[in-house]
Amino acid sequence: MGPDQEGLTYKAAGVDIDAGNELVDRIRDDVKRTMRPGVLGGLGGFGGLFEVPVDRYRRPVLVSGTDGVGTKLKLAIETGRHDGIGIDLVAMCANDVLVTGAEPLYFLDYYATGRLDVEVAAAVIRGIAEGCHQAGAALIGGETAEMPGMYAEGHYDLAGFCVGVVEKDEIIDGSRVGAGDALIALAASGPHSNGYSLIRKVLERAPEGAATEVDGQPVADLLMAPTRIYAKPVLDLIRNLPVHAMAHITGGGLPENLPRVLPEGLGAKLQPWSWPPVFRWLQQTGQIAEAEMLRTFNCGVGMVLVVPAEQADAALQRLRQTGETAWRLGEIGTHEAGAPRVQVVAA
């Protein structure tokens, strides 16, 4: 080492261990709020421990899911709205796990950035904890990675991991779906966490950008609304009424996601529904074709449930009693070769 050179430190290289410790202290109470029966140990261990609830499940099957929030994260960074993106992260994972009929048990997150901003990271993880609370899942661990030179200034990335449990003979896999079954839509809170690469292009065309008003609200509020988490109302429903299949409407919209849970030879016939104003604004501002809208966005439908036709009214009533906006979207019919598996038909 030369006479004018100082000794190197990890902090000088861009990694601040003290900031990481401060973050852990800041989020401790938020994480505690997510605790539930089954959690063993506390924050800071090398591995999160969770006891499988064999007292409530005869043949428990664990269901896992992992996801991110796509380029909605870039819009969150550009608008400085970091508190809701953590809810989005949990929702994308927990709603996927829920589709099998599984109860979310626990969640882990991965937060990566070039330089740790404790305020921003704490806001994100508060959102993750809130999402876990909504899903009924415990936040039992996570990783905060500070990697100098890997990300643009102020940028970060997120990934989430959720594990749930379902009784083996109660797994919902679509095998019981039959012609005549009813389709029930659960309302989305907005575009959720899909289609944001196209949304950002639309915003470039809007003269006022994210400050544009749609239906009396800044479009940024509508676009950054956290993804709805359906775990509690849907679990309540499947414990009381038969559900043959569920589809989480994410990337690819209804045309791509609904067929994933339908047996061969069956298709979905949807009745037209009223799209929330933000989707019509996106369509008009971006001059986006209807088919492209349906393949990119949820267009107001966050989840679809397939139930026996004779149970549709009871299912709607129960979902509405638990606070969901739900309506009859259509029905299952036979699928003719060469025709789309999902069709919007005249009422």
Curated annotation (Swiss-Prot):
Transmembrane segments: none annotated. Keywords: ATP-binding, Cytoplasm, Ligase, Nucleotide-binding, Purine biosynthesis. SUPFAM superfamilies: PurM C-terminal domain-like, PurM N-terminal domain-like. This is Phosphoribosylformylglycinamidine cyclo-ligase. Belongs to the AIR synthase family. The keyword Transmembrane does not apply. It comes from the Bacteria. GO terms for cellular component: cytosol. It catalyses: 2-formamido-N(1)-(5-O-phospho-beta-D-ribosyl)acetamidine + ATP = 5-amino-1-(5-phospho-beta-D-ribosyl)imidazole + ADP + phosphate + H(+). One of its GO terms (biological process) is 'de novo' IMP biosynthetic process. It is found in: Cytoplasm. Signal peptide: none annotated. Its EC number is 6.3.3.1. Coiled coil: none annotated. It is an enzyme of class 6 (ligase). GO terms for molecular function: ATP binding; phosphoribosylamine-glycine ligase activity; phosphoribosylformylglycinamidine cyclo-ligase activity. HAMAP family: AIRS. PANTHER family: TRIFUNCTIONAL PURINE BIOSYNTHETIC PROTEIN ADENOSINE-3, TRIFUNCTIONAL PURINE BIOSYNTHETIC PROTEIN ADENOSINE-3-RELATED. Pathway: Purine metabolism; IMP biosynthesis via de novo pathway; 5-amino-1-(5-phospho-D-ribosyl)imidazole from N(2)-formyl-N(1)-(5-phospho-D-ribosyl)glycinamide: step 2/2. The keyword GTP-binding does not apply.
